[in-house]
Every structure is written in structure tokens, then in C-alpha cells.
């Protein structure tokens, strides 16, 4: 993955090398039945968080773009017809309201998501309590050299977020920041172990 990679068009052209997106993960190419149900997609520290105020917390715009590119790849992989005919619903969760608002803005912006918008919900961790979706993407936002993760240390809340997916869980974050905390280090190692078993 080029660390400077950005979404190159509003159409999310998913048919080129632009979406090979290794992100330090390997996915099975042998069929959807063999694909792991959990992924931890790592990005570099160039994807920096920004503090935007007490009410809205933090935002990581590059990670938000990566989150939607990852979802576009997944939809493309399993096929538009299947997504729509089976009404495969998606929840995008972030602990920060600023990130939630930015993700909603991007979903409205990109034409790729127009057929799927009714199937996509974006909310905070607390906003998703008691709900499930077929696919869950979690944008962790925090990306700093100090390993500061704020209330992502509230493991009860994060555990709730991570158990909302029926089919597929995709966690997006800066591994170097997050794995300074023992819980996220174990989570990374667990998901890597799943990938290595393929």
C-alpha cells in the first residue's frame, strides 16, 4: 500500500491495482467461503488524527477515506447484485462524532454508494448499542506517535462495537498507535493469526 494513496475518483474504480490494498493483510482469493470474518486493516502514521473540539472529539480524514474505499472493495468483491438482493446491511462505527459526521458526508459525496445508501448506517459506538449489521467497519481514528488512545481504553464499549457483525468485521486503525495498548496488541495478533491460517 502506498502511504500516500488516496481515493482517485468519485467512482471508486475497483477494477485496477488501485484497490489491491494489501494494508499488511492477506485475503483469500479462493472464494468468499474461505474468507476470514475479521480483518484489522493497518494504515501508516501519515494518516494523522486531528482534534476538533470537546464536543466532537477527533477526526482522521484519511482513515475515513480508507474506510469507504475498503467497503467499496468489499461490495465489489461480493457483487452489487448480491448486496442488493440479499440486503446486506452495513454499520460503520467510530468512537468520535466528528469522524461519524465526516463519514456520512463522504457517503453522500461518492456516487459509488448511491445504490447502497439505504443499507449503510454510520454512528458512534454508543449509537450502535443493541444493534447488529451483516458487515461492521470500525474506524478507530487515533493515530499518533505517543500511543494515546483516549477513551478507546474503555474496553467494554469497544467490545460491544466488535460484536455487532453477523458476517464480517473490519477494523481500521494505526497498528503502531493501537498496539501500544495490550488489548489491541492481542486483537491484532489474533486477527493476524486468522489470516495466517488461510
Give residue ranges: language-model regions.
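Conserved helicase/translocase motor-coupling segment
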Residues: 1-2, 47-101
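A short beta-strand element within the Helicase C-terminal
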Residues: 131-142, 170
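Amphipathic alpha-helical transducer elements in NTP-driven molecular machines
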Residues: 64-68, 100, 122, 135, ...
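Short, basic, low-complexity termini and linkers enriched in Ser/Thr/Gly/Pro
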Residues: 2-11, 16-21, 26-46
Amino acid at each position: 500500500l502506498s502511504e500516500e494513496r488516496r481515493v482517485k475518483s468519485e467512482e471508486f474504480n475497483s477494477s485496477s491495482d488501485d484497490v489491491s490494498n494489501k494494508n499488511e493483510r492477506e485475503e483469500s482469493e479462493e472464494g468468499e467461503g474461505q474468507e476470514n470474518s475479521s480483518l484489522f486493516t493497518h494504515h501508516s502514521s501519515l494518516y494523522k488524527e486531528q482534534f476538533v473540539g470537546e464536543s466532537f472529539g477527533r477526526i482522521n480524514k484519511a482513515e475515513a477515506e480508507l474506510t469507504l474505499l475498503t467497503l467499496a472493495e468489499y461490495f465489489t468483491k461480493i457483487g452489487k447484485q448480491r448486496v442488493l438482493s440479499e440486503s446486506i446491511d452495513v454499520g460503520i462505527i467510530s468512537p468520535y462524532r466528528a469522524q461519524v459526521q465526516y463519514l456520512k458526508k463522504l457517503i453522500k459525496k461518492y456516487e459509488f454508494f448511491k445504490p447502497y445508501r439505504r443499507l449503510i448506517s454510520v454512528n458512534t459506538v454508543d449509537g450502535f448499542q443493541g444493534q447488529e449489521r451483516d458487515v461492521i467497519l470500525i474506524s478507530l481514528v487515533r493515530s499518533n506517535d505517543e500511543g494515546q488512545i483516549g477513551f478507546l481504553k474503555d474496553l467494554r464499549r469497544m467490545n460491544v462495537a466488535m460484536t455487532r457483525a453477523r458476517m464480517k468485521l473490519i477494523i481500521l486503525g494505526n497498528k503502531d498507535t493501537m498496539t501500544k495498548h495490550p488489548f489491541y496488541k492481542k486483537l491484532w495478533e489474533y486477527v493476524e493469526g486468522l489470516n495466517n491460517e488461510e
